[in-house]
Amino acid sequence: MSVNIRPERLVAVLAISVAVAGLLLPFKVPAATPVDTTPQAVTIPSLPYPQSGLRKRLASMGKPVPPVDESLQDDIPGQYFPPQNDDAKNIGQHPAVVALPDCDGSFPDDWVRILQSHGMGVLLISPNEAHPSQAYCSEGSLEAPKHGLTYWAFDAISALHYLVGMDGIDPERVAIFGYGYGAGAAQLAIYRKGHAKHFDHHFRTLVGLRPQCMSEMDNFVPSLLIGLKDDPFNPPAWCHWRMDRDLLPGRSNVSFEVIESGEIIEKQATRRTLSVESSAVIVTMVTEFLSKMGMAGDSTRN
């Protein structure tokens, strides 16, 4: 006995069969798009040096103003490390950090990776290469004074403006992370009465690891400083003294934590990074602070 099936019913049966077969096949997850985290060599243009209030007053009175010595101003070499977090890259704009090294140009590799893994781009700049005549790890003299902090802070502000102009970076979420001597310069880059007041863009917050607290702490944004107990290069006592001295009305909060390094004094008396600098305690402290400041992404890989 033959059965006549209408063409439209046959099409419907075939469609249902294909759908059921598809459900029985193993589900394939689309392959994740690989993230290129290779550092990119960049050159950061130095911003025009701001005119001080004194120079403006002299000019307004018609008095001669001596030229500014810009011989040590130069473009700043750097490396940009993109964030590792896929989501942070795909939502359009991600936070970024300007990283300032110690006076010998060193910056902990672990911290570049940690910041990347939390969805932040990292711009590591090299002020030493921009100003080779300034030997920052050595002491200056009356004949040849060292003004490294000022130059480094200005380099950091130039790097901030460079990042603000980059595609994919949120201009309102650029922080500064200083290490050792670089942390001292970073503090000067957020000083309310310093260079930063002359420019439109400001850092969102500051992190200083093993900071040399030689700069003013009258900050316009919150900061977290983490020192090591008995650190011979960057004594925590300097930071305590600065914090007490610069406790002025309107200053943003400065948090200062001192951590036991667990190292003998001989190992601390070097410019090499110490294992405690990227320990779970310090990583948690920093990433929670950055998250509170609106910086950290959703990734928790470190």
Kindly give the residue locations of the regions a language model identified.
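Gly/Ala-rich beta-loop-alpha elbow adjacent to hydrolase catalytic centers
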Residues: G178-A186
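C-terminal catalytic histidine-bearing segment of alpha/beta-hydrolase fold enzymes
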Residues: R251-N302
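Short beta-strand element of the alpha/beta-hydrolase
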Residues: I91-D102
